[in-house]
Amino acid sequence: MLDLNNVSYSDDGPRDFELIPDGTVVRAFIKLSGGDHELPEFGGGTYFKSSQSGAKWMPIELTIVGGPYDKRKVWQNIFVDGAKTDQNGFSIAKRIGLETIKKMVDSHFALDMKDDSPEAAQKRGSINGVHMLNGMQICFKIGIEKGSNGYADKNKIKTILTPGSQEFIAGSPAAVAPAATPTPQAAPAPSAPATTATAGVTPTWAR
């Protein structure tokens, strides 16, 4: 029989963390969480789809490596499709999503965004699906997303950094995160406006 009266609380420090300050630069491992929708043009990987719009996204978990925020986590969504299109009829969400994914790959491989050398092309070309982001280590600047609908403020990716930025923190592209296989899990459909491809809520261009 369960007896909680004999269970002592361990003194592991506070359970609630203060938000990481806006503008903090960190490195973190990526862990993907798949959904139940496939997008062949993005290669391997599965996505969630909003029941209220054309938005599709993949949740990511970022575990910070090193520094005062070691092992802290940041959760966001990579939006990869939406109903709104540009003047050429191309999905705005898909374009921004592809740009975000490319920045993550460039950050992992320590490639300058303007590097179009054969070596850079070979490294980018080795990524044949979004699923390959799983376990990559990237550098990014922390931001703070204002909470809405009763949710508290939370940290988010403000900017993904590459060697072209003076704030870029170099790491080892050979570093491998602890083995983890993405598994589908429930995620609330985002509902409020945002401005980045990795925001926690549905951007207007992804609806």
Model-derived segments and their meaning:
Residues M1-R207:
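Short beta-rich binding modules
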